[in-house]
Amino acid sequence: MKLEDMTLDLEQQVEVKADIGDVFKGVLYRFGEGSTNPNGESMQMILEQWAGGRWFRDRGNGIGHLWGHVQVIKPPVLLELSGPMFMSYPALNHVELRLEQIAGGTKVSLRHRAIGLLDAGHREGIGKGWGHYLDNIRKDFADGVAAQRA
């Protein structure tokens, strides 16, 4: 296996028309209880919002999957998660979400870096998956859903 097949470095961004503090709360919601798959079904994710907190999928009846831990949480500008994520094989992942106040709203930048025996299917689908997360955050503020949760 070549080194380039064993590494991943993906960056995506979205602009959200809302205040940075509100968007940060929206990020926490979408990475936790508000996490859905592209079909809109709940991913049953839990995000413990403190350094060292777990990020995991709780399917009930003792069934679950640890996606990672909160490495850094610095409201309202930074959330870093590290762990196996959705990869049930030898791999290390780091996801960084940076928020920046811009004219008219907030820019959310996501960077996912990984190293390990990366599955080709995961490599191909990662961009779509994170795009879904970011698009949901943007849509929450575009249609007022996030304001209703606050």
Where would I find each of the regions flagged by the language model?
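Conserved beta-strand segments that form the floor/walls of ligand-binding pockets within enzyme
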Residues: 9, 15, 80, 98, ...
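A conserved amphipathic terminal alpha-helix motif
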Residues: 114-150
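Short acidic N-proximal helix/loop "leader" segments that mark the beginning
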Residues: 1-11
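Hydrophobic pocket/interface hotspot
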Residues: 23-27, 55, 70, 81, ...
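Residues at helix-coil transition
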Residues: 28-32, 75, 135, 139-143
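Hydrophobic-ligand binding "helix-grip"
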Residues: 45-47, 56, 60-103, 113-116
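Short beta-edge strand/loop motif at the mouth of beta-sheet-based domains
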Residues: 11-12, 18, 22, 29-66, ...
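A short small-residue
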Residues: 6-8, 110-117
